[in-house]
Amino acid sequence: MSAEDILNEIKAAVINKAPGNAVITDVEFEGSEVVIYAKNPELFSNNLIKEFARDFRKRLAIRPDPSVLVEPDIAKDKILKIVPEDAEITNCIFDANTGEVIIESKKPGLVIGKEGSTLEDIKKAIQWAPKPVRTPPIPSDTIKAIRATMYRERADVKDILRRIGRRIHRDVRLRDDSWVRTSFLGGSREVGRTCLYHQTPESRILVDCGINIAVEDEKAFPHFDAPEFSIEEIDAVVVTHAHLDHCGFIPGLFRYGYDGPVYCTKPTRDLMTLLQKDYVDITEKEGKNVPYSSKDIKNCIKHTIPLDYGVTTDIAPAIKLTMHNAGHILGSAIAHCHVGDGLYNVAYTGDIKFEASRLLEPAVCQFPRLETLIIESTYGGYDDVLPERDETEKEFLRVIAETIARKGKAIIPVFGIGRAQELMLVLEEGYNQGIFNAPVYLDGMIWEATAIHTAYPEYLSKNMRNRIFHEGDNPFLSEVFKKVKNTNDRRNIMDSDEPGIILTTSGMLSGGPSVEYFKNLADDEKNSIVFVGYQSEGTLGRKIQKGFKEIPLMGKNGRSKAVKVNLSVHTLEGFSGHSDRKQLIKYLRKLKPIPDRILTVHGEVSKCIDLASTAYKLFKKETKAPMNLDSIRLR
């Protein structure tokens, strides 16, 4: 049966069972949902909606017909009249495709009203479905731009969703003897360019599609030359998190003809857009070939369908996706794919942290069903036991305090997302305790990434949420943090005799402001550089770690200049957003259910093999450390 035939059946059933005065105007597939448009959507009871969802075995959404929605300008005026001024409404964002209006305010409780009474008044007055949220304390240009794109291109976005819906909901029933296989196109026995390719007789799913920013040849990108891979056959792309080694090439897929959905959490959508734009800007400035443009990033945004943790969604014929917290960075997810009607279950961890941090809760380790687990191995080697976080924080603050005491500057190269915010929390506490007294400069994308963090407090740890909401203390707003707004600010910081701490991207000194700071501050022994994250082989960061005393770097005139390395060099591994060996093994021990097969990826050769070997000894299950271009039949 075609998707059109299925939709017609659903339409007939809805019209037959819906209240007569609901006035059904349309029923459509939009992405994974069946969307029912009605002039009086409030007449649909929760029981009737549940009955439809059970009968159709699909996610259901009831939305007001566009004709009954009050014009946004008039609707905003009505909202401001209904809601008490004390709520301090700062913005109203109207989404014509969903019929929702996001109401940002400093006191969302007043927008809700007693037992939701104010929300009901708003809905009756404007017909839009109100969604109150707390105003982010730091405005985000990225979120603003994404919302503007989605509003400006709303007609195109609706067409995209309907086209995707028809592809998802075509009638497909996998036989009991159907096969499931995964091809490893990148990130196997290496770190960088992560890309998995799940295949069934009816569907093709790409999970992550990253870039290895440490290399410049074809090894920077996944193996799109694999014989089984065809960009025209991809049904969906899933993104586990926003680091470039997992999401860096996704806009490139659109450049070369992909026209399907991208599934990720909302924070991942926003953060990956930020990183992709930054990657394009830096690559262009360095005169290198850029694999895609800002137009391709915009196209990616329009095709992105955000998912919440724990929500199961149809993403392709006979494949359902559920995303679970991975504990790595904001919005990071474990991608659990359910194939067929109980036929097979495979989960890919992405990058995981199985330990609570200041910022995030630990990774989820319990699933309804699981036959194959694909797990990262960044620190999977026998000797990869990282120091305890408390001890690492003390050592970090000691290095900072000593550097400031000798009137030096501490350069801390970091990924703009995740580790930067963790370190901000440590530095804020150290400053409050009087361990050091100097400004912390935030350069590169760190300020904007932090703004995005403040927009999604529900993804932060319970302790952070309590501190922000109940104690009224947002550490990201501390007076110690100073935004570096432009190159003049950067030059003034480098030329100043005053001590300071510089949090800057990129984390491996593969580009961005961190390289400029290093060039200008490396020869002064009063200064220090503190590595808090993994440094890939071949990067400037790895060379500094190895103790190079002189490093040739390109100057502004295009000529190579030898930079003397006199500053003190420190490496602190305990801040990693990855699980170390102990945490990885603990994760496998806690995993429920224990899968039949464990595959190790995302690590240097020895680390992937070591973790696979240990997993076999512990669980006596099939284990393997696949190589790039391997294909494994899972079922």
UniProtKB/Swiss-Prot annotation:
Cofactor note: Binds 2 Zn(2+) ions, which are required for nuclease activity.
GO terms of biological process kind: DNA-templated transcription termination
Positions of the UniProt region annotated as Metallo-beta-lactamase C-terminus: 577-635, 578-635
Glycosyltransferase in keyword set: no
A GO molecular-function annotation: exonuclease activity
Region listing for KHb, in residue ranges: 70-137
Span of the signal peptide: none
Record-listed Zn(2+) 1 binding positions: H241, H243, H328, D351
Cellular localisation: Chromosome
Sequence positions that bind Zn(2+) 2: D245, H246, D351, H602
One GO CC annotation: chromosome
Enzyme class, broadest EC rank: hydrolase
Keyword match RNA-binding: yes
Region (Metallo-beta-lactamase N-terminus): 179-382, 179-383
InterPro entries with a match to the protein in the record: aCPSF1 (IPR019975), Beta_Casp (IPR022712), KH_dom (IPR004087), KH_dom-like_a/b (IPR015946), KH_dom_type_2 (IPR004044), MBL (IPR050698), Metallo-B-lactamas (IPR001279), RibonucZ/Hydroxyglut_hydro (IPR036866)
Cited CDD domains: KH-II_CPSF_arch_rpt1, KH-II_CPSF_arch_rpt2, TTHA0252-CPSF-like_MBL-fold
Keyword terms of this UniProt record: Chromosome, DNA-binding, Endonuclease, Exonuclease, Hydrolase, Metal-binding, Nuclease, RNA-binding, Transcription, Transcription regulation, Transcription termination, Zinc
Chain positions covered by the region annotation Beta-Casp: 180-577, 383-576
Entry's family note: Belongs to the metallo-beta-lactamase superfamily. RNA-metabolizing metallo-beta-lactamase-like family. FttA subfamily.
Name under which the protein is recorded: Transcription termination factor FttA
Organism: Methanococcus maripaludis (strain DSM 14266 / JCM 13030 / NBRC 101832 / S2 / LL)
Lineage: Archaea, Methanobacteriati, Methanobacteriota, Methanomada group, Methanococci
